[in-house]
Amino acid sequence: MPRRADRTVTTARAMTPINWWVAEPARFARDRAEVAARFPALTWTSDGAGGWEGRLPMWPLDRPEPPGLADVLGGTGLEVVIAYRQAYPMVPPRIYPVDPRPEAVECTQHRWHVNGDGSLCQFQTDTVWDPRDSICGLFVKAAAWRVEYALMKAGVLNQMSLHGIVSDSAADHLITTASEKSDSGRDAVAPKIAGSAG
């Protein structure tokens, strides 16, 4: 059968890739508006698949800040690089803590909730992410990770909670405990990690 002259074959090489925000302009506008309203210290970057950089607030949770939080966190929230992936919003972005940056050994142990590449473990599986969810929910979880990380470093928490502290206030009293421990002149010491030197 002869080939019709009006048929064209598009090869992968002939296709020009576009960024997710070109394919999803409404989602891009929504993310930018929500982040500007809730996390104004973050700056958008269009490098790669885009993302945000900056410092998260110490306590963006929907309950009162526990006494001693500023002492435990050294007066600053988590500095992050948030890297979207081109499949966003079908897949969540990766959140990389910059300050404080987890130690290499902490990226190999589940109890720190850090992946091997240094990004935060946000979900038990990526299928928990709902593409309709606000991106700000992930930023709140990252800020809360910073609190649990400080509590572990202070030795008042042995491992991070399974579901995080965003919706669970059970560990809030530990913030005051860690602050009082620091105020009493005792140095905050990271819990001994089995099999590590030192």
Question: Whereabouts are the PLM-identified features?
Answer:
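UBC/E2-like fold recognition across ubiquitin and ubiquitin-like conjugation systems
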Residues: 1-77, 87-198
